[in-house]
Amino acid sequence: MADEKNQQAAAPAAANAGTVTLERVSNPPAQTWNRLRANDITLTVPSISRKGDVHFALPQLFSKIECGMGQKVTDWVCSQAADSRYVEVPRGTRREEPIVVSVSADEGQVADTGVMVREGASATIVVAASGQGQAGTCASLLRVVAEARSHVTIVEVLGVAEGQQHLESLGVSAADDARVEVRQYALGGGTLALGSAIDLAGDRARADLTCRYHARRKDVLDINHVVRQRGRNTRAEVSESGALDDAARKTLRATIDLVHGARGSKGNEAESVLVLGDDVVNKTMPVILCDEDDVAGNHGATIGSVSPEQIDYLMDRGLSRREAEQLFVRAIFEDAIMHAPEEASHRAAVLRAEEVLGADVAHDFDGGAGLPEGGEAAC
């Protein structure tokens, strides 16, 4: 279809671009003390003039969707993307091939994508971000409308090189009886900033969001998750888990907002953090907002290291302490590689696993030979 053609082009070289600072983006609905420095992130990103370009804009409906990194990032992506891409999944159909958004920090690619999943339809959307160079920024803005009784699966596999950064902003609006599944794999790099906002606007809508992450050395990982439960009898399940090594810095803001009128709704959020480095900085801000009586909301976070008993058990079987700890990191990458639904996301996970774990280990669980070919790619 014409409206599904690849509209994205690589950005000009960084040498031809200026920069702009996005101040205090990826804010949560309710903030904590500023002195904790957990409310937002400030990013310096390329700024390329698109003056004179003819730009295809998404339908106006998409501009009303809240996105996880906020309006400043949305405006920046729209100004930097060579074009916007619109995909529509017809009513009552099941789209077999995934809708793929693939961006590279090496090429400075920025993607603006809108997906309309019509009533009773189902689709899988994949975002893959990768990079192997010394510097560069890539970004993806994905906005999804899930109509009544639709089923949307979103898989994000994100990993760039140490001197690079990636911005990932997601916004989803779900109508009556719609189901949204989001699986995120944040596999590290210089700076990874991702925000997700899911609006359960319809009755009995459901969202399941799972995020697995790894950061090491001096990586910066910033995550903002927001689920707004507006319809009656909605369900939200949010789960984050990961490992932090060396001097990595991670901030997570996770908010479940039980809006007035969301009677009978339930929301749960939980995070588990494994700390492997002495200089790790971990900040977690789980929040439940409630403006309705007949609702249930739960949240929590646990942080710890590998127990001495587990270390002793593994060392008795011939592993060093470091090798024993790396088993937990390996499990994150194995999950990402094994569950990548197509070639671009699989490649992004393998490239990052090779960098972190080594090529031999990365390919121990590389089952990519049977992957379907690409789908509707965006690069």
Predicted regions and their residues:
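Conserved beta-strand/loop scaffold segments within soluble protein domains that form the structured core
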Residues: 63-319, 333, 337-379
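Long, low-complexity, mixed-charge
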Residues: 1-80
